[in-house]
Every structure is written in structure tokens, then in C-alpha cells.
Amino acid sequence: MSKLQQFPLSKGWSFRDNEATSEDAWMPVPVVPSVVHQDLQANNKLKDPYIGFNELEARWVNEKSWTYKTVFQKPAAPAGSCIVLAFDGLDTFAKVKLDGNVILENDNMFLARRVDVTKALEAEGDHVLEIDFDCAFLRAKELRKQDPRHNWASFNGDPSRLSVRKAQYHWGWDWGPVLMTAGIWREVRLEVYSARVADLWTEVQLASDHQSAQVTAFVEVESVHSGSHRACFTLSLHGQEITREEIGVTENGTAKATFDVKEPSLWWPHGYGDATLYEVSVSLVKEQEELHRVSKKFGIRTAEVIQRPDKHGKSFFFRVNGVDIFCGGSCWIPADNLLPSITAERYRKWIELMVHGRQVMIRVWGGGIYEDNSFYDACDELGVLVWQDFMFGCGNYPTWPNLLESIRKESVYNVRRLRHHPSIVIWVGNNEDYQVQEQAGLTYNYEDKDPENWLKTDFPARYIYEKLLPEVVQEYSPGTFYHPGSPWGDGKTTSDPTVGDMHQWNVWHGTQEKYQIFDTLGGRFNSEFGMEAFPHMSTIDYFVENEADKYPQSHVLDFHNKADGHERRIATYLVENLRTATDLETHIYLTQVVQAETMMFGYRGWRRQWGDERHCGGALLWQLNDCWPTISWAIVDYFLRPKPAFYAVARVLNPIAVGVRREHHDWSVTHAQPPKTSKFELWVASSRQQEIQGTVELRFLSVNTGLEVRERIVHENVSIVPNGTTNLIVDGLIDHTVHSEPHVLAARIWVDGQLVARDVDWPQPFKYLDLSDRGLEVKKISESEDEQTLLISTKKPVKCLVFEEREGVRISDSAMDIVPGDDQRVTIKGLKPGDAPLKYKFLGQ
């Protein structure tokens, strides 16, 4: 017998171009995991592809094949043990050779592989491990040619990508470069053991009154020789053991233990309670010797997607532990094109930003990867719900038998790997593949329920989403909701606003509607929508090397914006709404104002609709993050620098949020004639679970003078509906013949004497307003070793006061509207005494 030992093979690797045959062509690999672009950069063979036009200079890498090699010594293997070579991820077409003999051929980036090499390592001493990585870019083209009858309809990247189980964004997307990576992208190691815990998972039954729960822990054991193994299970909370049970392992290598938990501490998304994690451990024992020990954290909670007929159609919202959750959040793309460079610390910083921004759900998009364990660990610990796509995006995927088998293995592996995470509340079959079906006119008869028929149509991928994947989820994670696609709703058109989820791109893409009416364009769950904005100047400085290129329409800036037609779209929304500028810093700021306003109008209205029989169940903006320094829809850039939209969304998602808006007057289709009257509305949105009392004030303040133009409205002792919307004014009226000067509607709400939320509605568009000479004052009123408090006041209304984003500095709020008589405080952490104060900018400055 031997206790399981692991020997990471992270050092001592070298690599070379497959076409190079000389011994001096080998170059050292600093560390594995890595991909070839990282290793080429480390050897000064490649410039940073994220800077300038260097992506073009890296394109040669896309069409190359590579070999990685290392020499290792056979580990000591006691009698009765085996030696396994374990690969957690190979990218992608990999032929693995041990001492010249092929032991594995891989064609799926998303699949871990294990090879028993006990016999291959019988000889003592050194052994040579080589991995040939064939060019995925060229292999994909070959595979496409082999099936000319298949309709290769797709958006983004070369259509041949559909034939390869590799991160689809590597072929380029409308926010990312074409960087075809290859390499050992996740850990590789040797394992020596006589028996091991191959899998450990739990199934949880929570009583309806939440006073008790039943936790069943399951284990699968692999052993070299049969024998009387025993599994010692322990259940712990906060490091303290609650109970334990020892069970004999069956002949087929399984064991389970059931624990009754009284008064369990539940796992909640942040803002609703503690994200409590229990820990289940199993120790595999034989003859009193521990052979292997595995622990996993899990949560006790229920999670449902509620779909029921109502006056709006059919609902689509999430319920956790019996509580309806409005899921305000973001879509997530891979945080880097060079995936091994993302550390656990960087993942955690991203999720911490989500919490800081009051976002409760993150959608792992289907054109990237099944994320690293540390990503989901952070979501578990910080209470962020995960919408998890399977890795299919924007295409009509072929269904060759060998590809279907690979997809099944991939989905089984990843569902099993991730099923213990309480943060994952939904698995979704694909991203926008049903939209491709619609736009390409592919056959989709929802009433035909025979999967074999689907394979015979020109949309065979339906078989993956409506048979293969739901069967895997049902078998391996039966408590998790499965949804065939995003967007999708009961087989209806993907733009149907009455059912399922929808991607609303008629702001920016499509009909390019005014962002001021975004809330009228939504559906039951808005899982994509967005607006582009430039990142901050510090990020531009990173990838634009030449000062002469720092103007809004420079070639290098256009190169770093991969969205088709971005010039026209950005120009349209700027010219419609703002006084434009030609200097880069102001242009950056103006695009950020547009993005922040767009997100605010969408989120604010959709959250209000939550209170109307769950008309809108959630909103996930496109997108939270970037995979390289770029100009995109991200609200936080590659370097984790929030754009103003991040703060605008956070305010709308406040647990108690006040909202005010006047009806939209479309100036661009009325010859810019001003309206004679305007209706306005005032409401409160609350995610609190109990009714609370509050006081709401609405003031009407002149943009030009800062004075009140009419008597303020005050609602005292308002009963605020729990987890819903309280409408205070639905038929307010502004008579512009009486109140002709432009004015803002400034709303505030107090609860228990504390001012908890604000909202300011402005006359639209901003370009018609004179926003000069505001009388703004930003004053430091306290300072400690690493924290400052600023007091902000103004004589006239100020729009979108944005503070500089600086490395290591966190701001409590930004992108703020400031009005007279309502001083606001901002806390800055990480700014040391003596550091230069943060710069700031506001509209009209």
C-alpha cells in the first residue's frame, strides 16, 4: 500500500517549432502551465501581442505546430501501486509520447486526461516526455473541408472553429484578437498510489422550513487491487467537525454517508445573507493506513428557475432558499487570451469587484472556457451566483459521432468537476446558436421531439442542446436547472420578450435605438445587452506607444476595437447625446458617459419591472471584463480599472434604490422641437425582505442656476414593498410653458433617518445644456494612513463626476451626479498621505 503522492511536472520543460530539427532550436519553458505565446515572449521571440499592432506580428504563431519536452526521473513506486500521468488540460491537438511511444492523443481542450504509465516506467532513471501540439487553426480548416455538406453558419471567427473543441474566442471575436494558443494550459503531474478518491460530491435536501437538511456524500474510489477499503467521511463548518461516519467501500468502488444537519446555516448570494460553506472530507483507509484524503466545500441551499404563466407571458427568474432574487450582474469572458497567466488572486479580485458593484450574478459565456476552480471558489465564498454556459458559441456545430463522443466526455467531466459549487445555479446549452439557426434559416421544428430526426436536419446541433447536454446534467447534477440556450424560450423566436431569456442588442447593434428607452426593449430575463466605451487613459497608454497616435480615430485605436462598425455606432451615440470633442482624453470620457447612461437606463427600468409580477427577472450586461487591453463593451478593463458604468450599475442595484424619470421625448424625430409638457414618475425599488418605512423627496432644480423651479414633493412614512417596487408618482406632469428653463429632477430617500439612495433625471439630450461654471467643490475632510474622505458640493447640478482610477486605489463611488443642497461623501482607500490627489472630470468641464 502507498499513500497517494503527487509530483508536479512544472519545471524543466523546453519547446521548439515542429519544423525546426536542430538541437539548438529547443528553448526553455519558464514554468508549466503555459501556452506557446508566453514561452515565445520569455525567449524574446515574440513581442507583447497586446501592444500596438503586435498582434499582427504574432499571427505566424497561429499556423505553427509545436513540441514540448521534459525529462523526469521515475518516482519511487511501492509494491502494489501504480503511476499515472495526469493532464488537467492540453490545448488542443496533442500527441503525448513517453520514451518515444505514443501513450495519448488528445483533441479536446476542455477535458482532463489520465494515463496509467506503470508499465511504461518499469525502467529506473530518466524518462523523456514529449508532447506534439498540432496546429489547431489548420486542423480546423481540414476538418471543415471533410464535411462540405454541413452548413457552417456562424458569427465571429473562422467557421472552421466549430469543428474543434477549443476555446472559440481564440479564433478572434468582436472584442478580442486572433491568438491561437497551444500548450500545457493546465497542470500536469505524476501520481503514485495504490488507491485514490476519484470523485467526491454531495447531494443536499433542505427541508421546506429550513430547520433541517440531509446531506449525502458520495465517493468513487479507484484502486490497483481489490480489498477492504473504508471511507471515513467528516462534515465540518468553519473548521469545526460536526459529525463523522466510516463506511466500507463496495466492490464497485463506491461509498456514501448521510448526515442530518439541524438548523443548517444556509448559503446565500451576497446581500441576502451569509455565503456559508460546509466542508465534506473523505479519508480513504486500508488496514488503519490513510491512502488518500479529499475535501470539498459546498453550500446548503435550494436554487430554482421559476417559469410560470403570468400576464406578461411566462416568467423566468431565480429563487434561492425560497427568496426571489433579482439577478443584476454581468457576462464574463476569459480574463486573458493567454489563460495560464490568470492567477487565483486575479480571479478573486474580479469577483470582489462584482460584490463591490452590488452585482449578484455572473454569466460564464459559452465562447470561452469552463473556468478554473479558483473562479468558482471565489464565487462560492463571496456569494455570487453563476450562470454557466456550455462551451458552444455563435455557430451551427457539426455532430459527427466522434465529436459527439468528445462533447459528452467534456460535459461529463466538467459537470462532475463543478457540481459541488453552490454558486452554480444554471447550466445553459450554448450562446446564441439558436440565433444563428434563425438568421441562417436552418430547420428547427420545436414540435418534433425525436432526437434522431434532429441529426438529419441542417441544424443537427439541436441534438447537443436538447438531448446530450440535458441528459448529462440530469445524471450528474440533477438538482441544477438546465436551459437549452441563451437566448432561448420554449422554442419561440429568440427575440420573443414574453418567455425565456433574451439578448437585447437593438441599442448599439440592430436598429440602434436611443439608450433612453432601453427598459422598454427588454424581456423576461435580459442576459445580454451593452454599450461600448473607451478604457481609461492609463490603459490606452499601455498599448499605444506613439504619442502621435493618441487621438480618437487613430489606426492603432481602431485596431484595438474589434467590433464591426464601431466608428459609426460610437459616433451616432455621441453626436445624438453630447457635445463632441477631438482631444482623446475628453473623447474617452464622453464614450464612458454614454456607456454609464445606457447601463443606468436599462438596469433602472428593468429593476423597476421586477416589482411588476417579476416582469423582468434579471439583467446581465455585456460585459464585465476584457481579455486584453482594448476598447469594448466591458465596464471594467483588462487591468481591473472600472469604467464609470460600473458605478452607475452599482447605484441602481442598491438594496434600496429610488428612481425618477420623465417620459422620453425623441428630439431627433421631432425636428428637435421641445415638448410642451412632460410626464414623470417616481418609485422605490427594494430587495429587502421586510416592509420598511422611508421618506422620499423630489426636487426640481434649474440646470442654469441651481435654484428650485417649483415646490419640492415630499412623501413621508412611505411603506416600501419588500422585494419589489413601490410606485409613488405615475402621472406627474411638467408644464414647460410654466417651467421653461431646463431642470433636473433630484430624488432622495431616507430610511431610519439615514440617506440611503439618490437618483437624478436630466433633460435629454445633454448636448443642449450649458454645463459650464458649475461651482463644484471637492474637499478632503479626513485622512488616515490609507484612507481619505472627500466632501463634494456644488452650486449648480453636475453630471457624471468621474474620479481617476489609480493602481491599488479603491473609490467608494464615482460617475456621480451632484446637485445643490445635497453634499456627497466619497471614501478613497489605498491613497497614502502625500500622494497626489485623484484627478476628476465632469460633463461640461
From Swiss-Prot:
GO MF term (any one): beta-mannosidase activity
Active site: 432 (proton donor)
Domain of life (superkingdom): Eukaryota
Swiss-Prot/TrEMBL catalytic activity: Hydrolysis of terminal, non-reducing beta-D-mannose residues in beta-D-mannosides
InterPro entries cross-referenced by the UniProt entry: Beta-gal/glucu_dom_sf, Beta-mannosidase-like_N2, Beta-mannosidase_GH2, Galactose-bd-like_sf, Glyco_hydro_2_Ig-like, Glycoside_hydrolase_SF, Ig-like_fold, Mannosidase_ig
Biological processes per GO annotation: glycoprotein catabolic process; polysaccharide catabolic process
Keyword Hydrolase: yes
Glycosylation sites: 252, 717, 723
Keyword Hydrolase: yes
Metabolic or biological pathway, per its Swiss-Prot or TrEMBL entry: Glycan metabolism; N-glycan degradation
Enzyme nomenclature, EC number: 3.2.1.25
Keywords attached to this entry: Carbohydrate metabolism, Glycoprotein, Glycosidase, Hydrolase, Polysaccharide degradation
Top EC class of this enzyme: hydrolase
Further details from the record: In contrast to clade A beta-mannosidases, which are likely secreted, clade B proteins appear to be intracellular.
Family: Belongs to the glycosyl hydrolase 2 family. Beta-mannosidase B subfamily.
Function noted in UniProt: Exoglycosidase that cleaves the single beta-linked mannose residue from the non-reducing end of beta-mannosidic oligosaccharides of various complexity and length. Prefers mannobiose over mannotriose and has no activity against polymeric mannan. Is also severely restricted by galactosyl substitutions at the +1 subsite.
Descriptive protein name: Beta-mannosidase B
Record organism: Aspergillus fumigatus (strain ATCC MYA-4609 / CBS 101355 / FGSC A1100 / Af293) (Neosartorya fumigata)
